[in-house]
Amino acid sequence: VRTSKGGPGIENTWSAENVSFPTAEGALGDGPVLNLRASTDGTRSGTKQASLGTRSSEFRDGTYAARIHFSDDPAKGEGGDHVNQTFYTIGGSGTKYSELDNEYMPNGGWGRPGPKLDTVSWYDHESNDRVYRTTGKSLDGWHTMMITVEDDVVTYRMDGEKLFSSDGKYAPRSGMSVNFNHWFVDLPFKGDRAWDMKVDWLYYNANESLSVKEVRSAVEDFTGEGMNYFDTVRESR
């Protein structure tokens, strides 16, 4: 759980208080989920953002998948905020910098209208060298988001549908961490409101490029056997 300073969004507002694990309708077995809440009263001091990720940066090739509930409306308060609901990987620095993003913005941001999902492969964040594809539609509800990395080709999929691919210099050059965060691009008005982003499960396979059907089957098999968390990444390399 991130509590460190810095961005993105409203800097120095990352809070462990906004990370929780409630049960949720529509989750696998209607069980507990990760809930990341972005809340504000419209001021910097009254803002809390939420982020959770892996401590290690050992992820590179393979299949990344997460079942995520994106929200077009706040859980409480007035709507219209430029919130960013993100599933991403990041690692390395300098010539090894690597970042792969799924960024959902129900109300847009940075002057671009929403709802929209940006799938982004980075080469260099300092020079803003990246390639991306925008999917301009509402994603309110549950979706299985996937990123596969194989032979220096990155492919983004949603619910099994291919959204975007990148290759060459826009493929990862180092190990990365896997993260989820929920943050405000800006604070356009005053008043209390809170937005929720939910994550049902995260699955990673370092050795294979899998289909959404194969991922869902694996997750259901593991859950059915009572395995709610395990890490074999180090053993698979």
Protein language model regions, located:
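Glycan-recognition/cleft segments
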Residues: Q85-S121
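Short beta-strand segments enriched in hydrophobic/aromatic residues
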Residues: A38-T40, F70, Y104, V149, ...
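Short, aromatic/His-centered strand-loop micro-motif at the edge of beta-sheets
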Residues: T119-W142
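Loop/turn elements at helix/coil->beta-strand transitions in domains of secreted/extracellular proteins
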Residues: G31, Y97, E150-V153, G175
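Low-complexity, Ser/Thr/Pro/Gly-rich disordered linker/stalk regions
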Residues: V1-G79, Q85, G91, Y204-R237
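Short tryptophan-centered beta-strand motifs in secreted/extracellular beta-sheet-rich domains
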Residues: Y64-A66, G141-V149, V154-Y156
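Aromatic sugar-binding interfaces of carbohydrate-active proteins
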Residues: K137-S138, V153-R237
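Structural recognition of the beta-strand scaffold that forms the well-ordered cores
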Residues: N35-R37, A65-A66, T86-Y88, E99-E103, ...
